[in-house]
């Protein structure tokens, strides 16, 4: 038996930096489940905003990226997770505070330079490396 989960999220960029969230002691990209009747574009923007505190009006989708697929077994059932990804530019004030959504288990949000990515990816999920 298998079940399918669809999610949507973004690689958020600003000033040559990428935004990551910290959840379950790992760095990850902001994303969330697609709700019935809501498209993947809108879901990506809403989830980024909810998880980081950035205003939806300051999030500009630049490009749709290739979706990823992730399979895992839970209690004998296979779960297939498809994530729609977007390249998103943050056009707001770079010094605006980031507010992690603690209700979702997010403990930190932080901008990282491309040079710092090696260190960040060491503490991330294998599927985003």
Model-based region annotation:
Residues 24-25, 83, 129:
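Small/flexible residues
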């Amino acid at each position: 038996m298998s079940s399918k989960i669809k999610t949507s999220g973004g690689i958020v960029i600003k000033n040559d930096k990428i935004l990551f969230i910290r959840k379950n002691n790992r760095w990850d990209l902001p994303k969330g489940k697609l709700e019935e009747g809501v498209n993947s574009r809108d879901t990506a923007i809403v989830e980024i905003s909810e998880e980081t505190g950035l205003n939806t009006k300051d999030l500009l989708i630049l490009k749709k990226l290739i979706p990823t697929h992730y399979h895992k077994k839970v209690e004998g059932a296979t779960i297939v997770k498809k994530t729609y990804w977007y390249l998103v530019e943050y056009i707001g004030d770079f010094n605006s505070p980031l507010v992690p959504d603690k209700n979702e288990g997010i403990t930190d949000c932080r901008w990282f330079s491309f040079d710092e990515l090696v260190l960040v990816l060491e503490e991330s999920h294998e599927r985003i490396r």
